[in-house]
Amino acid sequence: MSIKAEEISSLIKQQLEHYDDKLDINEVGVVTYVGDGIARAHGLNNALAGELLKFDNGSYGIAQNLDSSDVGIIILGQFDNIREGDRVQRTGRIMSVPVGDALIGRVVNPLGQPVDGLGEIKSDKTRPIEEKAPGVMDRQSVNQPLQTGIKAIDALVPIGRGQRELIIGDRKTGKTSLAIDTILNQKNQDVICIYVAIGQKESTVRTQVETLKRFGAMDYTIVVEAGPSEPAPMLYIAPYAGTAMGEEFMYNGKDVLIVFDDLSKQAVAYRELSLLLRRPPGREAYPGDVFYLHSRLLERSAKLSDKLGGGSLTALPIIQTEAGDISAYIPTNVISITDGQIFLQSDLFFAGTRPAIDAGNSVSRVGGNAQIKAMKKVAGTLRTDLAAYRELESFAQFGSDLDQATQAKLNRGQRTVEVLKQPLHDPIPVEKQVLILYALTHGYLDSIPVEDISRFQNELFDNFDSSHADLLKTIRETGKLPDDKKLSAAIEEFSESFAPSEK
């Protein structure tokens, strides 16, 4: 077969046209040490902080320490099959996780891989776990309430969409229950929820997932789980992975609620990694940048401006205290980053006041702007009344000769405490919360025995559902109190027919 000269020249021209003079250079290093979830590698001179690195066996790691002689790497997942002398190469990108609707209703690990046995997650979109927080001009003020369904929170420490509200307290004071109940209350509220379990026992997470399924909440919830048996890097990246999943919905104009349960365990995992990487320890052996660990995470929660779609990401970080000490390092850090805190007290919890919210130490710095007008009106004096009651209660123990005004305050205080109690997994719609608080603040409960308050509330709700649904509808749809005379007459009519329990 003969080839003509002009064919050769046209082939050469064709090759020259498509010639790419770019060289494909991969920077490769060698592992010099591996153990306890970290590795050191020599030869990655141009690696960037936070860059994703790939090991020979297919495992991934994140460049954490950039020293002159080597790079400190935190290994994602199991590190048993990585050996000294293995090769590790740069990827030129930071770690990403799958995002989108395909994750809703699933339980995943911090890498976005399913752990619920329900098969593969088909998602073609990913987002980097580290993202710059929205700037000042990209945000708008919090102006829409996020109803938790918990009377003590919606009345005393209201939360708005786009807020960061810390839940803080000792172990076994109901922190997780508060967060789970808030997720349950988002049913039919068009809010996507993400529950990030960091270092929680597998059995505990299983129980929470079963609860969410039982109440139909998994239809709008993603669970990200990093168990205590996982290597420390997985616990460290879990909140960032959860936030990346939430940001995808936020930037598409949706409202998202994310719960971090809990950030104390993430801080401990980060301390472990930092000490293994030989970073200098600071207060309580935490590294110097532990504040930045949480601030860069929580600053990503925001209410976006209308120009960016008006979506929101509301964060409920949880912090565990030791013996009620909220002045420890991590609690004070997170208190200063968030827009308020809900403080749960073990004394109240064991005394039967549940949720055990300490009204004196709990505050919401921006949620008040988002509260509906009806709730603002009925709950206005509730906090001061409760604080006055707690003060009087301690004095009343010393003597029985109390004047009428003091006795009236004590009676009202006892009923306030009773009204704010609420059973587990029983969120109450905001219109019914307004109703019972209206009855309380207008004195309709003053003559009801304390032990009958709970029954009075339930029967009042049933009565209004059947006979005065229009009044509840007005509160729900307008956010304002209905006509004072009508509401008072309806409550009065029910109060007269209510029969207290016989002693």
UniProtKB/Swiss-Prot annotation:
UniProt-annotated site: Required for activity, residues: S362
Keyword Ion transport: yes
Subcellular location: Cell membrane
Membrane topology: Peripheral membrane protein
GO MF annotations, alphabetized: ADP binding; ATP binding; proton-transporting ATP synthase activity, rotational mechanism
Range of residues in the leader sequence: none
Function, as annotated: Produces ATP from ADP in the presence of a proton gradient across the membrane. The alpha chain is a regulatory subunit.
Family stated for the protein in its record: Belongs to the ATPase alpha/beta chains family.
Protein's name according to its UniProt entry: ATP synthase subunit alpha
